[in-house]
């Protein structure tokens, strides 16, 4: 049975109310996304125990951290915290900064060691230096390492890359992605950056005005029209997890496999076998009720079925689609196209994908 992070908080302020209920997998990276003032940081403070919600419940795996009778303070919660600023101790070496939390963790509870954390975060050559000798990105990697060396059950990250430029963000994101895969430490990551979100997210929570607007896997949320206002029209469509299976040098293409289906994209400088997340915009999806009768320039045509049709505005419609691989994708079509196709739930269709965006090609990353 999968461990879950369960949380329910109600907090009232003169001009803002937080009212959320979450049931999240205690694995992978959960990204809390929303505009400024949506309640992201307040939620993180409640999860960490920095703030006690008057009406609150929190449980991770089999441990209750807050209910009507219980409130475990932050220092007893086995939580790692990483903020926008690295907050390193200037008088200590990088090694001593890293060991600060480790030395305050009971020996029996130390699941991670300095050498393995330093290796994963590429800090080995920095251990004897002082913080002032490090770049902003290096300092933030040290802050992440210090949090990990407390052997936390949960790592909370509050916009940790917000103060860094795009180049440094691009350097740090791969390290964050490795944390969960290497150490199996679940992460709750707060951001309002779409670039960071698309690089990192496994499970997504959209907050708006203190409430959960949408929650689910990245595939579910990006193919759901309910996310339209929060993530923007330009993001709706599909996010697919694929793996590189072959490079076609003659035609300059890379073959991507996912769940028994295939996509072809321009040649990528990525090794065969490596995973690659791709984004498909709903307006780059066209539909047909029959396979192409002749040769077509569209390389990516997938079989699927219609789940439902919705109205976006008087001239545009959304079509929720399930690919044969079981993955959701959203298409945006005109009213005229809908009339021509006469789409019905359950109807087999063919999805023509005109453009695919690779996540490592996102602007600035």
Kindly give the residue locations of the regions a language model identified.
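ABC ATPase NBD coupling module
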Residues: 64-80, 104
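A short, proline-enriched helix->beta-strand linker immediately N-terminal to the Walker B motif
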Residues: 149-153
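Conserved ABC ATPase signature
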Residues: 130-134, 138-140
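Conserved ABC ATPase "signature" region
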Residues: 63-68, 109-126, 177-178
């Amino acid at each position: 049975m999968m461990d879950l992070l369960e949380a329910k908080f109600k907090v009232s302020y003169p001009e803002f109310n937080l009212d959320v209920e979450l049931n999240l997998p205690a694995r992978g990276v959960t990204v809390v996304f929303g505009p400024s003032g949506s309640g992201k940081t307040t939620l993180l403070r409640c999860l960490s125990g920095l703030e006690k919600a008057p009406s609150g419940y929190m449980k991770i795996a089999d441990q209750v951290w807050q209910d009507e009778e219980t409130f475990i303070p932050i220092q007893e919660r086995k939580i790692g915290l990483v903020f926008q600023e690295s907050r390193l101790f200037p008088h200590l070496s990088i090694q001593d900064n890293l060991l600060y939390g480790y030395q305050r963790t009971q020996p029996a509870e130390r699941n991670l060691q300095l050498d393995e954390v330093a290796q994963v975060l590429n800090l080995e050559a920095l251990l004897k230096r002082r913080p002032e000798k490090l770049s902003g990105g290096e300092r933030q990697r040290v802050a992440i390492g210090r949090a990990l060396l407390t052997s936390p059950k949960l790592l909370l990250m509050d916009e940790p890359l917000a103060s860094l430029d795009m180049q440094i963000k691009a350097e740090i994101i791969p390290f964050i992605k490795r944390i969960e895969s290497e150490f199996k430490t679940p992460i709750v990551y707060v951001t309002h950056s779409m670039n960071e979100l698309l690089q990192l997210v496994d499970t997504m929570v959209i907050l708006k005005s203190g409430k959960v607007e949408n929650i689910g896997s990245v595939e579910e949320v990006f193919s759901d029209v309910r996310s339209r206002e929060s993530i923007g029209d330009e993001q709706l469509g599909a996010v697919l997890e694929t793996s590189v299976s072959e490079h076609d040098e003659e035609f300059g293409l890379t073959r991507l496999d996912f769940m028994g289906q295939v996509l072809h994209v321009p040649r990528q400088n990525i090794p065969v076998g490596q995973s690659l997340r791709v984004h498909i915009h709903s307006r780059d999806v066209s539909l047909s009720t029959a396979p192409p009768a002749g040769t077509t320039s569209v390389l990516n045509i997938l079989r699927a079925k219609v789940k439902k049709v919705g109205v976006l505005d008087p001239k545009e419609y959304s079509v929720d689609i399930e690919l044969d691989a079981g993955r959701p994708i959203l298409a945006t079509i005109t009213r005229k196209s809908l009339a021509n196709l006469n789409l019905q739930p359950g109807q087999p269709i063919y999805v023509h994908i005109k453009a695919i965006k690779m996540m490592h090609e996102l602007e600035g990353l």
